[in-house]
Design a protein with these regions (language model features):
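ATP-binding/phosphotransfer module of carbohydrate and carboxylate kinases, centering on a glycine-rich
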Residues: 1-54, 172-326
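Short glycine-aspartate micro-motif
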Residues: 4-8, 56-60, 96, 130-134, ...
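Short, acidic Gly/Pro/Ser/Thr-rich loop/turn segments
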Residues: 14, 66-68, 138-142, 197, ...
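Active-site nucleophile and cofactor-binding loops and adjacent substrate-binding regions
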Residues: 32-34, 74-78, 96-102, 122-125, ...
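Short beta-strand-loop/turn "lid" adjacent to the catalytic site in phosphate-handling enzymes
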Residues: 51-115, 132, 275-279
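A short secondary-structure junction signal
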Residues: 108, 142-146, 201
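Short, electropositive alpha-helical surface patch
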Residues: 112-121, 322-326
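Glycine-rich phosphate-binding loop of actin/hexokinase-like ATP-binding domains
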Residues: 115-187, 278-279, 285-291, 295-300
């Protein structure tokens, strides 16, 4: 029986799914901590061994980084993925490497209504341009345009555009980050590591002091997750200030993308962070920054805006792409 393999490689975790052609449910789906492996081939060995099959007709790998040709160096992980080497090692005749947000773009087609939280219904246009954007370990962006009876997905590295501060605090944040990185992209701020960078800026510039409990929580595990959790609990001012600043920059960035693409088919905010802070994004600062486009605020208000709440959208998109190759 023909099987197809889908893989969504992220800086924090990697999702793998193998399915039989013509069947609905996957044979096996697993999540692996990316940092536990030295490369993708080692992880695939473990996964296929557990799946109990070595017969894979097609595979699609969604990767966080620019994809050009058959070999990709990941942006937020010390891995290089070589499609031809994987094809030879695992006897997979058809392998596709795509950008992780290209996979998210494909995944939009198979989302269910309860996979979306609508922030702004707007005035959706059938076959209109769509944008997918999302912060996680990095900041991904892709466009979708209607071509030949369906949506074509266009990957980008839009998260690496220059950060443009909107007020004095953001300008001070820019100067702080320039001391560490030189060039400051939106990804330096709108990402998990970016939220931590905002916290460090606030702390180092005397704009807030963390409690001993927050310091301990950040040191014990995922620092960005700890900041988010403490901010949402409402009893840690520096975490709240950091998250509020984060969503303002996030909203402004998404608004910039809206002006560039005029996505009358909708803007879909995916990634690992948005669904976890949806209440904060609904509260006001995100939407105010999204709308704050001067003479074009009225236009921005007509564009549909959704949060994708299904964390597996990239895997769903990669699976759809792999199925099409059989």
């Amino acid at each position: 029986m023909n099987h197809f393999l889908a893989c969504d490689v992220g800086g924090t975790k990697t999702l793998l799914r193998i399915s039989a052609a013509g069947e609905g449910e996957p044979l096996l789906q697993k999540s692996y901590p990316s940092a536990d492996y030295t490369g993708l081939a080692e992880m695939l060995d473990d996964f296929l061994r557990e799946a109990g099959t070595s017969s894979v007709a097609a595979a699609c790998f969604a990767l966080a980084g620019p994809v050009s040709g058959r070999r990709v160096k990941l942006t937020n992980l010390p891995w290089e993925v070589d499609a031809d080497a994987l094809a030879a090692r695992f006897a997979i005749p058809r392998i596709s490497l795509i950008n992780d947000f290209e996979a998210v773009g494909h995944g939009i087609a198979v989302l269910q209504p309860d996979d979306l939280l609508t922030l702004q219904p707007g005035a959706p246009q059938a076959q209109g341009v769509r944008v997918v954007v999302g912060a996680g370990t990095g900041l991904g962006v892709a466009w979708l345009s209607w071509q030949d009876g369906g949506y074509a997905v266009h990957p980008s590295e839009g998260g690496h555009m220059d950060f443009a501060p909107a007020d004095a605090t953001q300008y001070a944040l820019l100067q702080h980050l320039q001391q560490h990185h030189g060039h400051v992209s939106y990804e330096r701020i709108v990402s998990g590591p970016g939220l931590v960078a905002i916290f460090e800026f606030l702390r180092d510039s005397g704009r807030g002091s963390p409690s001993a409990q927050l310091i301990a929580a950040m040191g014990e595990g995922d620092a960005a997750e700890a900041l988010t959790r403490f901010a949402q609990q409402g009893d840690e001012p520096i975490a709240q200030i950091a998250l509020d600043l984060f969503v303002r920059v996030y909203g402004a960035f998404v608004g910039n993308l809206a002006l560039i693409a005029l996505p009358r088919g909708g803007i879909y905010v995916a990634g690992g962070i948005a669904a976890k802070i949806a209440a904060t994004m609904q509260r006001g600062d995100f939407m105010r920054a999204f709308h704050d486009k001067g003479r074009y605020t009225g236009l921005i208000e007509t564009l549909p805006l959704h949060i994708v709440t299904n964390p597996q959208i990239g895997l769903l998109g990669a699976s759809l792409a792999a199925r099409r190759m059989i």
